């Protein structure tokens, strides 16, 4: 057993007390990214090692692996703790997104070690999509590179507001304060182009030697700020979804018997309470919350992130993909939107193509109306293109086969994030973040039911020669 873990259990008074204490710790999800060979995997290995998260058999195995695959001579190659794929170990690079878990006395952590190579941008975007903080590694010898800018842009595009710029390999520049200051100023100049109000912090460190990772460095007396671990333990993550209006996407209609009909899902944002008046979209029908059912029994209220089942006072038509929100909120359904897209398929995204999309449990079909621009993620300039290639990022106009209820991704990632699915292979080929839902004059919600709208779309798609009118007034 890990000796540090054994000591923690003893201090808490037993396994059960320790597990209860773990449940009450806050959780921080973060990713490490940067240019190739900046030391991302080594940094994670150092965090695991210095927080005593490595079991004795793992440490013994690491000694053996360091002799066979290591790049640090007689020293432990801590990157081998993370680089699990054989291809990664042989090349000394990270290809897949590797997840690791550790905890300290103050917090629990989930780390995503993402690839640095440009051809693995899609892997990096996947890792960033669930994270709240990004550690951007910069080699002190090289300074701010194009890949550093690219990873910064992708992180902020996916809603990450907290950036920790870790200037690594300070031991190779003699722990120079001048080098640290120059890189810090260069990055801040670039960061002015990034969107949103960002919390940016800088830490000079050496992942290989352990300077300023989990303990203060004696080699950099000029730096009086916190270590990287202290930043991770103390950074305040404001959960945007808590303050947002109620959004409850229905994942499953739960009807175990004739006496119970509930709507199961995870509350995406806001809060809901018994007796609250709610509205179902896109139908627009209203009802009251009769019960909030959870695994631990009935509740009077529920908050964002909790998996619940809602029971309403009225028997109304609700199906998977419908959205429940407060009755007094006006949120129109739209049939088109501009979407920031990260393309993940070999076949480029082109105007005129159709894909299935999935958003908050709702699956429908979409058409690519046009590509406004592709972002050159090395310098953040925009250029006109005819199609969006593999790993390309751009702003795309989409039209949907049926009305959807959308939020901007920066406001609500659950109801603003979508994936593209190839209709033939059923493979996920892209990720989208709603930039702006495009409002248009649509039929009143009560005029047509969801079934009538779907049937109308089906007839127009498969039997165009019938000349059926679009109930929503579109061409």
Curated annotation (Swiss-Prot):
MF terms (GO), sorted A to Z: ATP binding; GTP binding; GTPase activity; sulfate adenylyltransferase (ATP) activity
SUPFAM superfamilies associated with the record: EF-Tu/eEF-1alpha/eIF2-gamma C-terminal domain, P-loop containing nucleoside triphosphate hydrolases, Translation proteins
InterPro entries: CysN_GTP-bd, CysN_II, CysN_NoDQ_III, G_TR_CS, GTP-eEF1A_C, P-loop_NTPase, Small_GTP-bd, SO4_adenylTrfase_lsu
Region described as G5: 206-208
EC number: 2.7.7.4
NCBIfam families (UniProt xref): CysN (TIGR02034), PRK05124.1 (NF003478), small_GTP (TIGR00231)
Name of the featured protein: Sulfate adenylyltransferase subunit 1
Organism: Escherichia coli O157:H7
